[in-house]
């Protein structure tokens, strides 16, 4: 009886362990009863999803074509293991990605989440070096980076606000540098022959603070990775499929391994992929069983997920999304041009992303509920208020989101 009463008071909080929150302090989450287009619906409200449900819902909700593709595949068969079996959707998606991605990024290893796909990329790079007799053990990454929440991803990241459980000993083989040329040159001169890989979120660092940096840094990093024979990994889980204003940053600078997730399936079902070039793949291709990549997620290459990804990519190409993303960026530029406030440290935007960084994170307390009352779902983090726009968003909806963000500051009392 006591447990039943607690459930009535707390609702689902008793049974669900939510992410990135101290459960004892957590406010009751908004309960979604429907979603369509760019809108989320609660029992008594309608709000624009300004963050694309953690940056993945590029086509919005209830896209009929994706729903139909998934339904058709479910009616045929919903899943088979990829060990010893294969199927048409995974073959088609692999072929499509081979054509869709730049250079010789041809070899697809599928996973069920972005974090796992990053783990696979790091494992590939490390074993690639082991297979060729190299004793390299160090990993190079960036400050303010985030690559996921599984163990190697936590080590690669530089995000103490998320992964404070790691000790210095846990990260002894990882070096983090800022996105500055001098730091890049120095670390390669000092440790270049010790690195098995350099992993980056290219151009846009997401959960580490929405930091943006120059393509010139990546171009020089590519040259140094070539010079020191270091595997260059692009974590494009968040940046891929147009988020930076480029289809992929890999179109501008070619990595050895690219990781895709989130928008790969447009958020309709979890799936991710690690794609390697010929050099990496050939480092495993031999007569030795011990050279094989010993990894195999249960749901890798799930046929329903592959069907969703194929349809999502088809829509992305057919609807000329790169023009849509350019329009979003141009409109955001006009809407924030000249806007300043003492609480705001910097306003940044790139492609389909807008970020207000504040001096003091406490000034964002209450913004989520404020936005909700104004018909916008937002979820600020650290010292960041941001939007990751769905690509189907209309001009009036962009304006509504940006106005809510700006008005929060202009309505602050005593500032």
List each language-model region with its residue ranges.
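Conserved N-terminal phosphate-binding loop of PLP-dependent enzymes in the Aspartate aminotransferase
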Residues: 2-415
């Amino acid at each position: 009886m006591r447990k039943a009463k607690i459930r009535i008071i707390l609702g689902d909080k008793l049974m669900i362990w939510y992410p990135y929150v101290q459960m004892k302090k957590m406010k009751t989450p908004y309960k979604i009863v429907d979603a369509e287009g760019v809108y989320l619906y609660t029992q008594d409200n309608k709000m624009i999803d300004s963050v694309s449900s953690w940056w993945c819902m590029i086509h919005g909700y209830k896209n009929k074509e994706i729903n139909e593709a998934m339904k058709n595949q479910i009616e045929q068969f919903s899943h088979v293991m990829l060990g010893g079996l294969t199927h048409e959707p995974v073959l088609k998606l692999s072929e499509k990605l081979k054509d869709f991605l730049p250079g010789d990024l041809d070899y697809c290893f599928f996973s069920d989440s972005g974090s796992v796909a990053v783990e696979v990329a790091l494992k590939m790079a490390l074993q690639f070096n082991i297979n060729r007799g190299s004793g390299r053990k160090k990993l190079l990454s960036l400050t303010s980076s985030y690559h996921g929440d599984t163990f190697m991803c936590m080590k690669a990241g530089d995000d103490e606000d998320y992964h404070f459980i790691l000790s210095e000993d846990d990260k002894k083989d990882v070096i983090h540098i800022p996105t500055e040329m001098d730091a890049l040159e120095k670390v390669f001169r000092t440790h270049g022959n010790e690195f098995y890989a350099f992993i980056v979120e290219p151009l846009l660092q997401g959960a580490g603070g929405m930091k943006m940096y120059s393509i010139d840094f990546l171009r020089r990093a590519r040259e140094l990775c070539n010079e020191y024979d270091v595997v260059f990994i692009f974590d494009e889980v968040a940046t891929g499929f147009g988020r930076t204003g480029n289809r992929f940053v890999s179109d501008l600078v070619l990595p050895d391994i690219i990781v895709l997730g989130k928008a790969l399936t447009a958020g309709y079902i979890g799936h991710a992929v690690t794609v390697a070039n010929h050099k990496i793949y050939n480092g495993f291709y031999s007569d030795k069983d011990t050279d094989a990549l010993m990894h195999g997620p249960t749901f890798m290459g799930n046929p329903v997920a592959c069907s969703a990804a194929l349809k999502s990519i088809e829509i992305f190409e057919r609807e000329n999304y790169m023009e849509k993303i350019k329009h979003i960026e141009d409109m955001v530029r006009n809407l924030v041009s000249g806007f300043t406030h003492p609480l705001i440290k910097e306003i940044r935007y790139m492609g389909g992303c807008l970020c207000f960084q504040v001096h003091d994170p406490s000034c964002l307390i209450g913004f989520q509920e404020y936005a909700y009352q104004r018909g916008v779902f937002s979820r600020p983090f650290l010292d960041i208020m941001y939007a990751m726009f769905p690509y189907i968003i209309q001009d009036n909806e962009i304006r509504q989101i940006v106005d809510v963000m700006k008005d929060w500051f202009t309505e602050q009392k005593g500032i």
